[in-house]
Regions:
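Ligand-binding pockets and gating/stacking loops
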Residues: 1-166
Length: 166
């Protein structure tokens, strides 16, 4: 599939947070794993609450330059290991670290709805600004696709009567 964006992954899974839903559906990470394909094809999970991606923000006291230097050093170590063992998963790890670094600029821009026109927000319903709702996740899916993500899977619990089937 590839990716058209430098700052966002090619495959994203967005999970919802359903208040009051006790449907028993659990979204295990292996649902969007790469299976028999190399791990570089697995999905990146965007959470339904809080920061969409854990650890995208720099911790207190960590500057962008310091983080870049740390990432460069980790990359050097990983490349040395790759030269020794030729394991393609090491290349994937290097690419994942780089993507995580670039997502620090891509994700905040993605989730900033201040420039989204009100008439567009209205199309998604009254809960569109509530993080973790189906409306919000559909809006995020559209914004991801507009920014070059090739495949977005929206996982929403309780939509099909699993909670009241009797």
């Amino acid at each position: 599939l590839g990716v058209e964006s430098d700052n966002l992954p090619g495959f994203v899974v967005i999970t919802s947070v359903s208040k009051g839903t006790t449907c028993g559906q659990i979204f295990y990470d292996f649902y969007w794993g790469s299976g028999f394909l190399p791990s570089r094809y697995q999905g990146v999970k965007f959470r339904g609450g809080g920061s969409p991606v854990l650890y995208v923000e720099n911790p207190d006291g960590m500057t962008a330059a310091l983080k870049r230097g740390l990432l460069d050093d980790i990359g050097k170590i990983n490349r040395l290991k790759y030269q020794r063992v030729q394991d393609p998963e090491i290349e994937t790890r290097i690419a994942q670290y780089e993507m995580a670094y670039r997502m620090q600029t891509g994700v905040p821009e993605l989730t900033d709805l201040s420039e989204e026109p009100q008439h567009v927000l209205d199309l998604y319903g009254p809960q569109v600004k509530e993080q973790g709702t189906f409306a919000y996740n559909c809006l995020m899916a559209r914004r991801l696709i507009e920014r070059g993500t090739r495949y977005v899977q929206v996982m929403h619990a309780g939509w099909d009567q699993h909670n009241s089937i009797s």
